[in-house]
Amino acid sequence: MNETQMNRISKDKGFIAALDQSGGSTPKALLQYGIKENSYSNDEEMFNLVHEMRKRIIKSTAFNSKYILGAILFENTMYRTIDHKYTADYLWNEKNIVPFLKIDKGLSELENGVQLMKPITNLDELLKAAIEKNIFGTKMRSFIKEANSKGIKMVVDQQFELADKIANQGLVPIIEPEVDIKSTDKEKSEELLKLEISKHLSDLDKETKVMLKLSIPTKDNFYSDLMKDPHVVRIVALSGGYSQSEANERLSRNNGLIASFSRALSENLSIDQTDEEFNETLSNSIKEIYEASIT
């Protein structure tokens, strides 16, 4: 584990940029950026286009370590380069931004009010590749739609089982059990989720470090006590479908919670913008997300 990166993630002010749209969510991300689905005819062309978008974001002067602590990458992005450097190396060596890797393969069908992660059949190879490419940590997402205690327990059990394997390889896992912001019993789901997370944290080995990526809670500062747990490096929040302004407003009410936004970060960016317009739009978004993350 890179101690310099650990200190940066655990102590510094800023937020984590989520640039990890996968095959399923990439068309939506490109459409938001102004690239229609008829602009590409296969996955390779689609991933080339999204890498150009991510490269434009990462290389922007607005995307800098004053505001951004880390960036979460999609697996395909890890193998690609920016200015002849692998993306993770470019982020750390050129920008002082800590690289993370999304490792999940998407969600299973809804059962017991939740969607577990699909099996990660190539986990060992993926973690080996991540270490070779100088990745600091990983991220994996599950989804909670209903306050079903059995389902939520299954989600957290699966997350921590994987987190243990990841931490044993010297990487820092970001555990992401997202609660649906549209759920009618969101607050109850959050109570059940916190209970399960607390149980698992108390069972971890003394040296094991994890991060949590959670929906912005209904009750302000609901996760404050989890932040104090010695196993927890940082708790970050997903935007979860809120607009950037609403996500920022809700986030700012939660002290110590920092952003890890994806769609809300790239809101209002367009392929048709000049570099000046693009950089200005990105800069405004980054500064506003940063301000909401340092309360």
UniProtKB/Swiss-Prot annotation:
Protein name, UniProt field: Fructose-bisphosphate aldolase class 1
Database matches in Pfam families: Glycolytic (PF00274)
Pathways involved: Carbohydrate degradation; glycolysis; D-glyceraldehyde 3-phosphate and glycerone phosphate from D-glucose: step 4/4
Top-rank EC class of the record's enzyme: lyase
Similarity annotation: Belongs to the class I fructose-bisphosphate aldolase family.
Record field: catalytic activity: beta-D-fructose 1,6-bisphosphate = D-glyceraldehyde 3-phosphate + dihydroxyacetone phosphate
GO molecular function, one term: fructose-bisphosphate aldolase activity
E.C. no: 4.1.2.13
Keyword Ribonucleoprotein assigned: no
GO biological process, one term: glycolytic process
Location of the active site: E176, K213
Recorded name of the encoding gene: fda
